[in-house]
From Swiss-Prot:
Domain of life: Eukaryota
Name of the protein in question: DNA replication complex GINS protein PSF1
Amino acid composition bias (Low complexity), ranges on this chain: 109-130
Name of encoding gene: PSF1
Localization (cell): Nucleus
Pfam families associated with the record: PSF1_C, Sld5
GO BP term, example: mitotic DNA replication initiation
Region (Disordered): 109-134
InterPro entries per record: GINS_A, GINS_bundle-like_dom_sf, GINS_Psf1, PSF1_C
Major localisation: nucleus
Family, as annotated: Belongs to the GINS1/PSF1 family.
CDD domains referenced in this protein's UniProt entry, alphabetically: GINS_A_psf1 (cd11710), GINS_B_Psf1 (cd21696)
UniProt function note: The GINS complex plays an essential role in the initiation of DNA replication.
Cellular component terms (Gene Ontology): CMG complex; GINS complex; nuclear replication fork
Amino acid sequence: MFGDTANKLILDAKRSSNLSAIPIYQSDLVKSIVRETNDLNKDAEYLVEEQEQLQETQDQENSKINQCQLFVTHLSMRRNKRCLLAYEKSRADKITEFCWLNIDPIETSTSSSTTSTNTNSNVNQSSSNNAVNPLTKNLSNYTTSLDMNNLNHHEQDFFKQYQDLIMEFKSSFEDIDLSGDLNPPTNIFIDVRVLKDGGEVTTEYGSFNLIKDSQFFVRKSDVERLIQQGYLEEII
C-alpha cells in the first residue's frame, strides 16, 4: 500500500531521535520511496490525460472518479516527499548537534577499554575547538557519538562543511566562549554520577577514576566537558 514504506522511515527517524548515536542511513527505504513516488507521478500524468479525454466526452460521473483518483495520488506523492524531508532533517539536526562537540567521529566509533582525559587541556581547547551547543540542556539523547560509515556521501560532506563553518565563525570571536552555557551556574561544585567507565581524570583539585555508577563532588567547570561527552551526569 502506498505510504507504508514512508511510514517505516518515519518510525526509524523517531527511534533515532532518542539515541545518542546516529544509526546507519536507510538507503534501501529511501530508494524504495523515491521509486514509489516516481510511479505515482506516472499515474498522475496518466490520470491527467484521461481527465482531458473525459472532459471532451462530457462524462461527468467518470470525470469525478478520475478527479478523486488524481487527488489521492497527489496527496500520496506529497506525503512521501514530507516523510523523506523529515527523515533527512532529523539526521541533519543530529549531525549539527555532534559538530558542536570536541570529539573525533572516528574515535567515537571504535570501542576502547580505557579513556584518559585531562579536563584542563579540554578547557583550553574549547575556546578554539567545537563544544556543545549552549541551547541544549537535555543531554540524555544528545548526539555524543558518530560513525562516519553510518552517513551517506552527502551527509559526510555536510558534516565536514558544517564543521568548517563553526570554526570560521568562532575564529572571529576568539575572546568570547560562544559555546558556553547561556545560564549562569547556580553552584560552583556539583554532585555527578559516572555513566560509563573511562580512564583517570586530572583536575586542579586532584584526580579520580571514571568507574560506572560511582559519584563525585567536583567543581562544575572541571567536568563540563565530561558531562557533554556523556561520561557524567549531574545529580540534581
